[in-house]
Amino acid sequence: DKTADYPTGCPDNEYLLSAQNCSCTMDSEGKIQLVTEDIRNGNGRAIKSKLWSPNRVDKIDAPVNAIFWIMKDPTIPPVVKLKGAALASVMGATLATKTSTAERVAAGTDLNALRIVPYANPFRTYPLVNDYEKFKKLVEEKNVACYIVNTGDFMGTKVKPADTLGILETIVEGKASFEKWGNFDDIEIMYDWEGKTADFKPDLNNAEYKAALKSAMQNRVDAVKGFAEKKEGYDKLPDEALAAVQKLVDALS
């Protein structure tokens, strides 16, 4: 687990078994304390005891029935559900995130800048359509559900680990209640979950928010077009992929 999400003194850190890339300091009592934030060292990691989670199992006798695209797009609510195999797969192909401290990047790179990393795999050495078709098949033929989970912030409000864990548990336990989101035909939204820390309800009547969301979706349209144009079309996706994200932009017009 990344330790930067759990500040020094956080009760969750009582369950750490080992840590690396973390620094330490001496407190007023002369005791050595672990510094979990990325202050001196970057990309702190730890092995955490399974006892950290009160709701845990050692084995799951069930097939994979859901895909979660984990993003850090500030225009997307903490969780939405995608309908349709093409949309589900292309949103993975246009996965928006921020540069992780685990990555080696050029000097001067803005770590807070949003960028698209198809399927969160910067190391792919084959055409992007291969992954697109595989994920599409899971949804289309295996009836796998697809969600986007935003683990960054939503329009300035931090989505905390308690929110993400609560969202996952609510869905896994079959307690999730999704409903149609605005004018989107293929996106549903859930407003409540276990451990919710703030009001994350998006206001599509807010012109500023709607424009930001439309811009984020347009970025995905541009990305899909770019796949077809760059590297002599090596990463071109089927036309249905472009149509699926263009439909989202049109719904915000």
In which residue ranges do the predicted regions lie?
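Conserved NTP phosphate-binding and transfer environment spanning the P-loop NTPase/kinase superfamily
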Residues: 38-253
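Conserved nucleotide-sensing/catalytic segment adjacent to the nucleotide-binding pocket
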Residues: 1-51
